[in-house]
């Protein structure tokens, strides 16, 4: 297996221009494909997950042109629901941001569509372990025709595009906000209004804000009543905004901001105080820990401070919260990250993976059902470990921070960062001294 060893880093300093946000990139591509008119999407993320979405859209008859560096995509919108030849199968890798929204969008029918066609959505083995039942249950209430091809509640799925009739739909919000995002994005093209009621506590609310914000940019307003009920008018058509700029990925910013907070000064550009991404709030956690944070319109800067552990609910920033788990090793006092059950249904079971790998470097860790408790280490007591990444891009990037100790760190399968940040280790090396 390929691996990379990072030697101890004395200091980090520099500016990192962030790649586009994965969450925004795949939402923008899907909305642009469904919208009337041509949309030029700029600062698109060039990564595995986005490639899976682009490949799927092409096979669904969407025309687009991609720049040589794959960061500008001009999408010819269909102005209608997707159509395909019966029996089409789409492979979506481990891209939840493609699997979930497409599951809902492919249920939609065009007027006059007399004979629904079947399509199969499948992916890597890990995708077949990632639950989708809450979304499918909600879509079935709205009139969808979906069947599980292997294990109940999990992909692969067979979908027939016989349409969604709207009406009252209940959806469980406790596992993933992507299920609600998928339902919201399909609802305007249903045959009638949809009233969505959330069961349980909605996780990752800031990701719903991204969805609602982007739907508005594409011409559709949603009535949001305190994240408990959403009303979406039916028989609508998305309208191209002509251009859409993808913000820098705030989750990807977290590794560099944490590095600056631990041992130097790092500025990230492409995301700032007006960002629509919830993970910008990661910087507030660093502030609470003692880092010096500066906010700009289009940048965030983190400078080294004396870091102290925190005990916080991080349900609102589940992806960026992983970075706090490794940064916690450099703080005084224990850190507890709470209300993160949905780590268990991500690219891997991130709670188990994080606890296992932190222990390898010498940390004392308690893994709860929905929390993790971490005791810090003196810099000289870190152990040189080989870090398993579990084909999870965020595990690889989080553990790069271990090199800010007095000990090297070896990361297995470093290329798994291609899911969201193919050049991560080059950028990390560039700011390291």
From Swiss-Prot:
EC number: 2.5.1.19
A GO cellular-component term linked to this record: cytoplasm
Binding site for 3-phosphoshikimate: 22-23, 27, 176-178, 204, 319, 342, 346
Residues reported in the UniProt entry to bind phosphoenolpyruvate: 22, 96, 130, 178, 350, 394, 419
Family: Belongs to the EPSP synthase family.
PANTHER family registered for this protein in UniProt: AROM/DEHYDROQUINATE SYNTHASE, PENTAFUNCTIONAL AROM POLYPEPTIDE
UniProt name for this protein: 3-phosphoshikimate 1-carboxyvinyltransferase
Organism listed in the record: Actinobacillus succinogenes (strain ATCC 55618 / DSM 22257 / CCUG 43843 / 130Z)
